Amino acid sequence: MTKKRGVALWFAATSAIFFTRALIFSSFLSRGPEVQAALHLDTAQMGFLSMLYPAGGLIGLTFSGPLVARFGTKLVNTATFTLASMSFIGLGAAIDAGNLLLAMIFLLLVGLPMAIVDFVGNIEGTAVNNASKHSLFTAIHGLFGVGMLVGANLASWLISQHSSITATYAGIGIFVGIVSVAAGYAFADERTPLPTKRSRDRNLERTASVWFEKRSILIAIIGFSFIMAETSAGTWVPIALTQVGFSSAAAAFAFGVFWIVITLGRLLGGFVVDRFGRRLTILGCALLTASGILVFMAGPAIHFPYLGLVLWGLGMSAGFPLTITAMGDDPKFASARINMIITVVYFSSITVGPALGGVGQALGIYVAFGIPAALLILSAALSGVTRPLEIK
C-alpha cells in the first residue's frame, strides 16, 4: 500500500468514527420529546437524564489514556463501539417500556464508551493530520457535523413513518457497530506491554503534569471558549428565537442552518489552515465567532439573527479542532494533553447549560450569550500559544 493510499484510508476510517459517534448522539437528541413523554419526565428531570451522557463520558475519560496505551486504538475502538451499540439498543427498549432506571443505566453506558471513542478519534485524527502534507483535522471533525445532520433528518423521517424508538435505536445501533468496528481495522495495532510500577508512576506523573503546563492551560481555555459557544448554541439558540417570535419549526430550521454552516466550515477549513497557519486561523475564528454572537444578541433590535448565526457557526467551525491539533504537537505528550482538553469538553457539557440558564433567568438569555462572547475575545488575545511547537 502506498503512503498516499495509506493516509487516505486512515483519514476515511477516522472520519467514519466521528460520523457514527455523532449519529448516535443526534438520534438520541432528535427524539427527546418522545423520550420525555415515554418516561413521564418533567423538564428538570429530562435535563438530569440528558446529563447522564456526558457524566458517563467523564467516567470513561478517567481511564481512556491507559486503555489506549495498553491495548491500542484498534482494540479499544472495537470494544467501546460494541458496548455503545449494544447499550443504545437496550436504551431504546427501556424507553419504550417506560423503565426509567434501565434507561438511565443504558444512557450512562452509551456515554462512557463514546467519550473513549472521542479520545481515540482525536488521537488518530491528530496522527493522520501530522502524517499528511495538508491540514485534514477540521475535515475529520466536519464528519461529526454530517453525522448530526443525518441523524436529525433521519429521525424526522422515521418519526413521520411512525417508527418506534426501540426499532429506530436498534437499527442505528447495529449500523453504527458494524461500520465503526470495520473502520477501526485501519488503525495501527500498537500496544505497550504491561507497565512496571516505575513506568506506571511515570505515566501518571506525565498525565498529571499537563494540567500544570502554562501552554496547555491556555489552549484548554481557548478550547473551552469554543465549546461553550457550541454548547450554548445547542441548548439556548432555539429557545431564544422562540422568545422573539419564531415558531418552533422556524427556530429548528434556523438551528439547522447553523449546523450546516459549521459542517461546511469544518470540511473546508483545512484550506484556510494551509493558507494562513493555525495561529492566525484560531485568531480569526475567535473574533468571527464573537462577532456572530454579538450580532445574534442584537437580533431583537436589528433583526439579523441569521447573519449572527452564520458568523457564529462559521467562526466556531474550525476553532476547537485546531486546539486539539495544538495539544498533539508533541507525540510524547499528545495522549495526556488531548485527554485533558476532551475532559474539559465533557465538563463544560455538564456545566454550561445550567450556568447560562441561571444568568438567562436573572438577566435574559440574550444577555447570557455575552459570556461565551467575552471568553472568545479573551481567546483571540491568547491565540499566540497555539503556534506549532518546535520538537527537539
Task: List each language-model region with its residue ranges.
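Intracellular juxtamembrane helix-capping segments at the cytosolic ends
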Residues: 115-130, 317-331
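Pair of pore-lining "gating" transmembrane helices in MFS-fold secondary transporters
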Residues: 4-31, 108, 213-229, 310
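C-terminal transmembrane helical hairpin of 12-TM major facilitator-type secondary transporters
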Residues: 276-323
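Hydrophobic core of transmembrane alpha-helices in multi-pass small-molecule transporters
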Residues: 19, 99-117, 304-317
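C-terminal ends and interior cores of transmembrane alpha-helices
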Residues: 82-97, 288-300
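Interfacial helix-cap and linker-helix signal at transmembrane-aqueous boundaries
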Residues: 35-36, 67-68, 157-162, 241-242, ...
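Extracytoplasmic gate region of multi-pass secondary transporters
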Residues: 28-29, 214-256, 260, 264
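Symmetry-related core transmembrane helices of the 12-TM Major Facilitator Superfamily/SLC fold
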Residues: 167-185, 369-384
